[in-house]
């Protein structure tokens, strides 16, 4: 009896993990939320009006005028593409849509978070 219960519990756990696993591609909802930008996976995201000290210093070192930033800033970002090659297609941190990623992912500007729970 205990073996059957253990087997059933294991099967249920595995089935739940498979159902909860993220898909291989960003959804169409994500693309609709990212008009004119690129979907990025960033280790952190900060709103323009609440940049921390270290982020402000980093932007200064890159000759970016902090006062001119009006949209969010992503830090340590990689691209997410639809095919699943290159930068990868899954994100365990913050998904954002950025319009300016000219700093090789160190800093991405013009970012807004992607709400995937629609």
Curated annotation (Swiss-Prot):
Keywords: Cell wall, Disulfide bond, Glycoprotein, Secreted, Signal. Pfam families: Hydrophobin (PF01185). Glycans are attached at residues 54, 115. Aerial growth, conidiation, and dispersal of filamentous fungi in the environment rely upon a capability of their secreting small amphipathic proteins called hydrophobins (HPBs) with low sequence identity. Class I can self-assemble into an outermost layer of rodlet bundles on aerial cell surfaces, conferring cellular hydrophobicity that supports fungal growth, development and dispersal; whereas Class II form highly ordered films at water-air interfaces through intermolecular interactions but contribute nothing to the rodlet structure. Disulfide bonds join 34-97, 41-91, 42-77, 98-111. This is Class I hydrophobin 1. Self-assembles to form functional amyloid fibrils called rodlets. Self-assembly into fibrillar rodlets occurs spontaneously at hydrophobic:hydrophilic interfaces and the rodlets further associate laterally to form amphipathic monolayers. The keyword Disulfide bond applies. It comes from Coprinopsis cinerea (strain Okayama-7 / 130 / ATCC MYA-4618 / FGSC 9003) (Inky cap fungus). Belongs to the fungal hydrophobin family.
């Amino acid at each position: 009896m205990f073996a059957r219960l253990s087997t059933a519990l294991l099967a249920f756990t595995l089935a739940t993990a498979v159902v909860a696993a993220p898909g291989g591609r960003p959804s169409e909802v994500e693309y609709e939320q990212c008009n004119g930008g690129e979907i990025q996976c960033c280790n952190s995201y900060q709103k323009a009006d609440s940049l921390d000290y270290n982020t402000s210093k980093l932007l200064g070192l890159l000759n970016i005028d902090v006062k001119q930033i009006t949209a969010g800033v992503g830090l340590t970002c990689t691209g997410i593409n639809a095919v699943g090659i290159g930068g990868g297609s899954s994100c365990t941190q913050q998904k954002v849509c950025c319009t300016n990623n000219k700093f090789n992912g160190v800093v991405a500007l013009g970012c807004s978070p992607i709400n995937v729970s629609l």
